[in-house]
């Protein structure tokens, strides 16, 4: 039955977009199309990746973990359905769930570690008031089953029928605010209720609400590690969401529910998931018509009578700074009750953002995958500056800057590989904003070092490495960095000496291999920065540390091996290089061991020479399952291998890069819910596809080289700023013609298998002749 419902939903999505796609699928020749002629957003399917299902993924990490709701490019607000609180369901939604518990105004995209946000949960209901959410397939509450065939998602828009209440819900968003439209049945006891304590992966620990006038409420939701959230509290996430919400129907019969949390009660994720939590919240105290209320677990509701198909709307602005900021955000963006106008503006914002890459050729399915991938790369790092320029600093104080937009959610270990190098091409100002955000965070917090996984000013310590240094070095090498570089270098230097190979020439267990190799790479980044800034002594110091990867290599085992602090290798496992977690983070040595992007010649020499390395790579790919789900070989579901297909370009066999990059594009990405083989990871999984489908990829951020591979499309036009366009034209490109026969750059024969960033950014045309068999003479110089 579930498969049939899914098929019907997919057919419905295809039917509703086929006319738009037909208009988009014009010939590749002719003048460049304008945004007015084309709705790039019609190619976006937000259901791609929108599942946390571990069974379908074949691994505990689950699938894409994206959300299907409404948002805008890099917007603060995401108005999205939530189907679950708790577990490792960071987006708050999973497609196979059969009930919805409400529509939140903040979400995270594609993450594990239990997630966070999911604040300001709004739910329309009818009948008796229920103050507990209930459980999927279990305890009853205010949640509702929903009609799967009615579910619709587009860029900036979401719609569904809540079948238990027979209420149609629609959502749209602006950058700092959002709007919900509910179509009610005839009922004397209709209602909109807001669960102010709700939070993905936990609970808000304190809330306040006040009635401003007969259409308006405002309040705040304080979230601390004591309430779980990011890493179930281990991520040190501490933030306050302020909201300013208005109802189209006047507040007459309204109230607050409050739950008395027992003194000393642990409020982490396990408590929120427990039956005791449902019992406690179901027995909440009701206070009628209070002007203001504060407490540890609150909700607000307004009741009214509705006629048949009566529309009732709610709009809200949020802020991480103040109530006044939330009010300004709403009033600046949504001035009236015209839902369709807000939706239209959201669509227009997406059309403009997505127009930065215009592809032609390929199939409609491939275009949907491409533009949905591009869409997913434009969710984070999101804005957390209010419309008046204020942002919450890492010192807990409001700040204002005229020189940058404060941004948040930096999933560093993931996004330094593809997402940030992609943005240096299509959104370089955003990369600069991110670096300024991380630098001011280091300054305001007093820590004066860079965080590796930032969420709303939290030094979460999630994952490993020093990815902010990679982004900094990459941006500086590309000439797009407008920081105080002396300050930035000082913070980067401190970061490298706090977390690196300084003390022993390697980093001991746990995760000795992953840490040593990742730190060696960012120590190379430091050497490049130091050299560029004229710090020759530092450059030599870090260049030596960048060779630390050699200190873990065991030639007898033909493998990197983790060392203990006393210098001894950890015992060799029975599974050898395939043993997951053997000195590695979420992977094995076969996968992590290729991560020496800054010294590929040195790595090749260490591993026995070019022929042996090519043979090892060939074996790895040949043993990889064609569905690319979690596996012990080329595991595309996890980031450490994302550069590996492009290593062939460095080994004199670029045709194998062309073969495998194209094959991965075809097999690991699909236009369906299960269309991402692993977590989206805040844009990284999708950025890989965008770059590879364009025929480009950066093996070593910090170096300005982009590998040339096999484009998916016949023509790709990238807007690179200052009125420049870089075009990648793949003549005779078909599913069979995946190999480059020859190339021209701006009309001149081009024999290299890579481009420089500057070649791309000054605009021009890379013209590739494609064929069905490898040309083993092209690109080997």
What does each of the following model-derived ranges do?
Residues 3-15:
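Bacterial N-terminal signal peptides that target proteins for export
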Residues 33-470, 476-517, 530-551, 557-558, ...:
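Accessory carbohydrate-recognition regions in carbohydrate-active enzymes
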Residues 522:
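ATP-dependent phospho-/nucleotidyl transfer catalytic cores
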Residues 14-25:
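Bacterial N-terminal signal peptides
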